[in-house]
């Protein structure tokens, strides 16, 4: 309990906050994770669906899988953990601080919840990217895969980062800078196994940030964390960011 109180106090006083989220934060919204016992990679081989080589071999198969995932995402809604991070951003910015949320998720739920200072490190399922001209465009509610580019008419691919691909231009630099400069770093719902995102917590710790981890299972970050909340994202965020009387009166975190 002492450590939790210390973490709350540090968060209240923090001026530069960086947050990393993974699949665990969207699990309560009904979005499958990848690596736990019920995760996507238990039933699907990532080499068959999430690599440039898989797409080159069988784009129809890959698009059919992504169309299924897109449908799951469109049915999902942000959960209290997403909204808690929106509220945290509001609090930090209202006192003149800086805030950046970096997510490995491609479901778009952080943006839907209202997060503003956001880096989608691995792209977004609800967008496509032209294979020829590189134009990114939102996918319509109903589309027959594969979609085609509205600018040049060429076939488009999912606008996500596959295994073996580079991150979106500028995304990593922005994320790395925020964690290197943070005085408080929060890592929520990630196994901390996928690089380079997994290194962000280590970067923050090495730079002197107070590091908090929220995850049901231990991760490689656990030995470094000043506080590890061994619980789910919704419960962990409620512990870390309880509503103030003012927030309750104004309807924040509802």
From Swiss-Prot:
GO molecular function: histone deacetylase activity, NAD-dependent; NAD+ binding; protein-malonyllysine demalonylase activity; protein-succinyllysine desuccinylase activity; zinc ion binding
Subcellular location: Cytoplasm
Pfam families in the record: SIR2
Residue positions binding NAD(+): 22-41, 104-107, 189-191, 215-217, 233
Binding site for Zn(2+): 130, 133, 149, 152
Enzyme class: transferase
First-listed, main subcellular location of the protein, grouped into a coarse class: cytoplasm
Boundaries of every Deacetylase sirtuin-type domain copy: 1-250
This protein's UniProt keywords: Cytoplasm, Metal-binding, NAD, Transferase, Zinc
One of the record's GO cellular component terms: cytoplasm
EC number: 2.3.1.286
Co-factor note (free text): Binds 1 zinc ion per subunit.
Superkingdom of source: Bacteria
Cofactor(s) of this protein: Zn(2+)
Catalytic residues, chain numbering: 122
HAMAP family: Sirtuin_ClassIII (MF_01121)
Protein family according to the UniProt entry: Belongs to the sirtuin family. Class III subfamily.
Free-text comment about domains: 2 residues (Tyr-66 and Arg-69) present in a large hydrophobic pocket are probably involved in substrate specificity. They are important for desuccinylation activity, but dispensable for deacetylation activity.
Name under which the protein is recorded: NAD-dependent protein deacylase
Organism per entry: Thermus thermophilus (strain ATCC 27634 / DSM 579 / HB8)
Gene (UniProt): cobB
């Amino acid at each position: 309990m002492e450590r939790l109180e210390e973490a709350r106090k540090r968060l209240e006083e923090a001026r530069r906050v960086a947050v990393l989220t993974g699949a665990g934060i969207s699990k309560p919204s009904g979005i499958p994770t990848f690596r736990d016992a019920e995760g996507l990679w238990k039933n699907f081989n990532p080499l068959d669906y999430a690599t440039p080589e898989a797409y080159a071999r069988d784009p129809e198969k890959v698009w059919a899988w992504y169309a299924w995932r897109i449908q799951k995402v469109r049915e999902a809604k942000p959960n209290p953990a997403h909204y808690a991070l929106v509220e945290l951003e509001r609090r930090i910015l209202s006192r003149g601080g800086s805030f950046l949320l970096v997510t490995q998720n491609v479901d778009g739920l952080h943006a839907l919840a209202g997060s503003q200072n956001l880096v989608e490190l691995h792209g977004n399922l609800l967008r496509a990217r032209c294979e020829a001209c590189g134009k990114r465009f939102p996918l319509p509610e109903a589309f027959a895969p594969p979609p085609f580019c509205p600018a040049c008419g060429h076939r488009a691919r999912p606008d996500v980062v596959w295994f073996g691909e580079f991150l979106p231009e500028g995304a990593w630099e922005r994320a790395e800078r925020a964690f290197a400069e943070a005085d408080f770093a929060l890592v929520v719902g990630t196994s901390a196994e996928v690089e380079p995102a997994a290194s962000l917590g280590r970067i923050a710790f090495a730079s002197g940030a107070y590091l908090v981890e929220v995850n049901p299972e231990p991760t490689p970050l656990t030995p470094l964390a000043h506080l590890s909340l061994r619980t789910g994202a919704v419960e962990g965020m409620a512990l870390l960011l309880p509503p103030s009387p003012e927030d309750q009166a104004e309807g924040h975190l509802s």
